[in-house]
């Protein structure tokens, strides 16, 4: 990656100031001591990766931040050494198994809450991967592995990312589904969550914003295999074209600073038994757009058609390599 202009580089002092101001604007807690530990432990990842802000529309929810890593690193081991994560956490073996796939090539990134520290470990698998590979690693409990048939039955056969939530002991599995997404397929995927079907205008808005071949994240309880939530994403939505969002998200998108050459705003519509909410992410430093482009993510206004996915789906393959 070429050197960034100084105003686009990650600066720890500026980040602390921006973190406090953004958290105050949305009513989120900050724990400076934990923030300092995070920034020191992962100083190279923040310096060389892309950093972004995250939050949800839920009142009082955390202001979170993530680095998308350009470095191949055991972020879990580093977090354990720094006291940010318990090395005996039962989810650690799952991350280890996923990280060992495909010759050990998956790249780990990490999410942190401003008030609590380590939140998630996030893995990019290097492209389209068979869901069977991801959901059959030995560390995954049998009830989670048993969910594979439910996803394949909906045509969700390929995964690009996964994340573990350390506090909730859950995992998000990010599928790329062949679209275009319509109301019938939306309803089938939504039904996995057991939530109340959303209003027709909400569904219409989701369908209008997701790319043709869409990204849906499915949240699984890592003990029971229960599906807690489903979330549909729209990436790099311009400010002047953003969908209706709750007031807390609108405030977040207005006040969270971005020093990237191109702003990258992400909207996620999350549905589940416990209620629905909106997620938002916003680029900060390190050129988030560049990283997501390199990972073949689709942005608002693009065709959003994955020709490799379509070739795999058309042949009925669930064992294709990375694309």
Swiss-Prot record:
Location of this chain's protein in the cell: Cytoplasm
SUPFAM superfamilies membership: Prenyltransferase-like
GO molecular function, one term: prenyltransferase activity
Temperature curve summary: Optimum temperature is between 30 and 40 degrees Celsius.
UniProt record similarity statement: Belongs to the aromatic prenyltransferase family.
Name this protein carries in UniProt: 4-hydroxyphenylpyruvate 3-dimethylallyltransferase
Function: Magnesium-independent aromatic prenyltransferase that catalyzes the irreversible transfer of a dimethylallyl group to 4-hydroxyphenylpyruvate to produce the ring A structure in the novobiocin biosynthesis pathway. Novobiocin is an aminocoumarin family antibiotic that targets bacterial DNA gyrases. It is able to prenylate many different compounds, including the phenylpropanoids 4-coumarate and caffeate, the plant polyketide resveratrol, the (iso)flavonoid naringenin, apigenin, daidzein and genistein, and the dihydroxynaphthalenes 1,6-DHN and 2,7-DHN.
Organism expressing this protein natively: Streptomyces niveus
Reaction(s) the record says it catalyses: 3-(4-hydroxyphenyl)pyruvate + dimethylallyl diphosphate = 3-dimethylallyl-4-hydroxyphenylpyruvate + diphosphate
pH dependence: Optimum pH is 7.
EC number: 2.5.1.111
Gene name tied to this protein: novQ
């Amino acid at each position: 990656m070429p050197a960034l202009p100084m105003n686009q580089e990650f600066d720890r002092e500026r980040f602390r100031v921006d973190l406090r101001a953004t958290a105050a604007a949305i009513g989120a807690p900050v724990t400076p001591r934990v923030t300092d530990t995070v920034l020191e432990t992962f100083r190279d990842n923040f310096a060389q990766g892309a950093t972004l802000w995250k939050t949800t529309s839920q009142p009082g929810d955390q202001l979170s931040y993530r680095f998308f890593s350009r470095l191949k690193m055991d972020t879990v081991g580093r977090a354990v050494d720094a006291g940010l994560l318990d090395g005996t956490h039962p989810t650690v073996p799952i991350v280890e198994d996923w990280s060992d796939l495909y010759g050990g090539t998956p790249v780990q990134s990490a999410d942190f809450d401003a008030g609590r520290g380590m939140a998630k470990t996030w893995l990019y698998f290097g492209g389209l991967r068979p869901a069977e590979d991801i959901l059959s690693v030995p560390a995954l409990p049998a009830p989670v592995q048993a969910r594979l048939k439910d996803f394949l039955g909906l045509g969700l056969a390929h995964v690009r990312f996964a994340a573990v939530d350390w506090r909730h002991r859950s995992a998000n599995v990010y599928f790329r589904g062949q679209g275009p997404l319509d109301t019938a397929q939306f309803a089938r995927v939504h039904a996995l969550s057991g939530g109340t079907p959303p209003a027709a205008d909400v569904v219409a808005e989701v369908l209008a914003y997701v790319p043709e071949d869409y990204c849906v994240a499915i949240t699984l309880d890592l003990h029971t295999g229960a599906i807690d939530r489903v979330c549909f994403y729209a990436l790099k939505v311009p400010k002047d074209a953003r969908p209706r969002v709750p007031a807390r998200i609108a405030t977040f998108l207005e006040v969270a600073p971005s020093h990237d050459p191109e702003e990258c705003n992400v909207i996620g519509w999350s549905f589940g038994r416990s209620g629905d909410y909106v997620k938002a992410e916003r680029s900060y430093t390190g050129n988030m757009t560049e990283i997501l482009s390199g990972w073949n993510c689709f942005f608002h206004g693009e065709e959003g058609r994955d020709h490799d996915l379509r070739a795999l789906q058309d042949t009925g393959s669930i064992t294709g390599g990375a694309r």
